[in-house]
Amino acid sequence: MAKKYTKDYRVTDTLNEQGRRERRVDYIGKTYVWHEGDAARKALRFANGICAVGWAAWLLPLLPRSEATQTWYVLPFFLFIALPLGLVSGTLLWLRRSGEVLTHREADQASNRIPGCGLFMTLLPMLSLGGETILYIQQRKLPGRADVLFALGALLLLVCGLLLRRMAPHFRTEIRE
């Protein structure tokens, strides 16, 4: 747990019937709710769909062998898209299980991590597409089918990142009264 959230918890030690020490952790911090309520829940479901499409758009272009997957200034940017995509996917699944009332940590992750990862999911495909464009300008030939699939996957990931950035206002939280 991050040091930032340690004041939100209270640890109590008690003895059980067998004489063993049991440690209990209770959340005592502020609780948060979604600013937009049902609209935020719909946005979470839509964002989960975006992540599913993003994973397909990331994995499918890597399967066939192409010029882009063999070029050092194209492939690393495309591979690193998995980091923000994985962070967003994990955060969304975690938030989906959390219920209506959020802890301080969950509220921070919803408000900060999703838009930040959306930014990187926008920038990294741009860099990958830029590298692929340079590759084909240098080679002076048309790309093959696998390279077109790679470019379409990067474009789809770019759209996924833009959609996540656009949905950022839906993930605002407020302190529960």
Question: Where are these predicted regions, by residue range?
Answer:
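N-terminal, intrinsically disordered, low-complexity segments
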Residues: 1-40
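Canonical alpha-helical transmembrane segments of integral membrane proteins
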Residues: 45-65, 81-85, 120-133, 156
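Helix-coil boundary and interhelical linker segments in multi-pass alpha-helical membrane proteins
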Residues: 63-73, 137-145
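Alpha-helical transmembrane segments
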Residues: 69-86, 149-156
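Membrane-water interface of transmembrane alpha-helices
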Residues: 82-102, 164-169
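Cytosolic juxtamembrane helix at the C-terminal end of the final transmembrane segment
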Residues: 161-177
